[in-house]
Every structure is written in C-alpha cells, then in structure tokens.
Amino acid sequence: VTNDIRALFAVTAVLVGSVVAQDAQAQSKPRAPLTFRDSSVRHYKLTARASRIDPRVKAHPEIDFLIESKTGQPADVQQAAVDTRVAPRGKLVIWLMGHNEALFDRLNSYGLHAIRVHYANRWFSICCRENPVGEHCRGNIRLEAATGHDFSDDIQIPKPDGMMERAYQFVKWLARENPQAGWNYFLTGDGQGLRWDDVIMSGSSHGSTTAARFAKFQKVSRVVALCGPRDHLQSWQSLPSATPENRYFGFSHVLDGGWVGDHYCRSWELIGMHKFGPIVNVDKVQAPYGNTRRLITDFDVKGDARRAHSSVVPGSRAKKDATTGAYLHEDVWRYLYTQPVDVAGKAVPTSDACNKNQRQ
C-alpha cells in the first residue's frame, strides 16, 4: 500500500474514529470531578521502564528505537509526576520530548498530571531522507509512531510500541502503584484505554510536531506546541482534525529557524489557529494575550538561533530575570496549558507573506 493511499486511510480513520470515540464517551457514565484521597499529600515523581510494565515491548534498532543503549543502559525509562497538594484539574499532559523536570514541576503546580512516554522519535534522521520528500512520508511515520497502527511503508511499529499503548499501560501502572494520586481517573470506564478527551498532548520541536499530527487523528483536550509544529514539506496540517481547531496552542521565538523558513506560520495557519486571534508577542502584551492561540517572543538571545529554538521551554535557555534568575515566561506557560479552550480571540486573515506551498 502506498503512502498516498495510507494518507487517505488516515483521513477516513480520523472521521470514523472521531465518531466512534465520541459515541463511546457519550455512553459512559458522567464522572464526578477528580479529587485526591491522599492521607499524606506531596509532590510525587515516579519512573518506570516501558519494558518492565509491558512484556510485549520490543526494540526497533532499524530506527534507533531501543530498550537499552549500546552501553547497556536503560533507554526506555518513562517519567510521571503529580502534586496532590494542588487541586487537580482532571487533565493529563503527555509530553513528547526528553524529560523536562522544570516543565513538569510547573504543570503539577497548575493541577495537571504529567507523563513522558518512551516512543519512536529518532527515525527523523533515518527515514524520509529522499529529496524531495513525499508529502505524506513524515506525517504517516509520526502517526504510526504515535498509534502503533500501520500508516507508513517506511517503519513497522506494532501497537505495544506506539505512544498510545505505552501511555495507556503507563497510566494503568501508575493507577496501581500510586492510587492516591488519582491516575485511574484517566482510564475509560472499562479500563481498556485512556480518556483522550482529558489528555493534553504537548512537546517541543520534533515532539510538538508529532503531538499536533496525532491530534489530527485523535480528539484530545488540547495541544501545546512549543517551537513547532514544523514539517514544512508535508500536507497533514491541512487534513480534517478530530481535535477542534481552537484547542491548538503554539509558542516560539522569532529567531528560531522555523520562522526563517515560514515553517511555523504555515503550520499554524493550515491547522486553523489564525481563526482564534493574531500572532501576539508575549514580551509586549500581558496575559491572556487577547485569548489568541499563536504566541511569540523576541527576547535577546544574542542572535543564537539554537538558543532561540529551545528558549520557549523551561531550562537554561529560557528568558530569566538577570538578578534573580527567575523565569520571565511563567504566565505564558500557565496560559498555554490552562487557558479555557472555549475562550478565544477574534479570527484574522491568513498572511500572504507566509508561504504555505513550499513544495513548488
């Protein structure tokens, strides 16, 4: 089956899967708000190997998707965190990038549960290297890596090794090992899957692109794309979306290479984020930023594009107070992950200056 035909299958799967998921959730019993039953409230930080949780997990060395490194170190460690001292919002963030403890601390302080799962994300330097790359190549690989279903001819990721199943198995494990933290809230009534309507997909760079691609296929609570999405030669951004357009949020630095090539403006507009407000500079406008979905920063990174790329994530390259060292984008991160999705800015036209057809 060619990648073009698989792309058509993916569109059909979005439409059918979305209806099935909505029907299943409509038939489930209404849930009471999540509350913690923890006699000793605290900030929990847990780790577990995917291969220990699920014996079906396998390595895929052909795409550098490993269980152990070449030196024998565990490569499939997954992280989870929740703070039972904070009133829970009943939302689970699935983070698609390397573990970022500073980010997880902030997510937990907002009342969010957070996990990072081990999934196939190193294929990018191995697959779809032809020039020009097929318009569905990377998008289909992202979807297969996320779902464990056969969307691509270039990789073979079975269900146990897809992000969806690994996230589900991890949450099941957390519900057993850390029951006082309410992880079972995110399992379906029959315990056979995750309640994706309560999941926030998020990532940075490569991970933010996969998060957005997955949300086109599976309806989720929201998407937070930090320094992304990219895939400027791919067409998935304009596909029908199972996740409503108002649930996509983005934040990037203007000196990031994704702006030089119109990658970000293209993805943001094709996804439909312009329908909920203009691009807003968070260094010039205070929260809630006109309730827009498209945020940028232009703080001084000394012309360093590499720093600019990762400056929108908590860490050494983020904007900080020169005296205290405190992060200066705290309000931005809180907004991205907690702004009510039904509160949005006014639509603006797409930009003629942004090149949306980069395959010409």
Predicted regions and their residues:
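Bacterial N-terminal signal peptides that target proteins for export
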Residues: 1-9, 20
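A domain-start/cap signature at the N-terminus of enzymes
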Residues: 27-89
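Short beta-strand element of the alpha/beta-hydrolase
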Residues: 89-98
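Conserved alpha/beta-hydrolase
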Residues: 111-128
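Alpha/beta-hydrolase active-site loop
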Residues: 136-192
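Gly/Ala-rich beta-loop-alpha elbow adjacent to hydrolase catalytic centers
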Residues: 202-207, 211
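The feature captures the conserved acid-bearing segment of alpha/beta-hydrolase catalytic domains
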Residues: 221-319
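Catalytic active-site module of serine/aspartate enzymes centered on a nucleophile-bearing elbow/loop
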Residues: 306-359
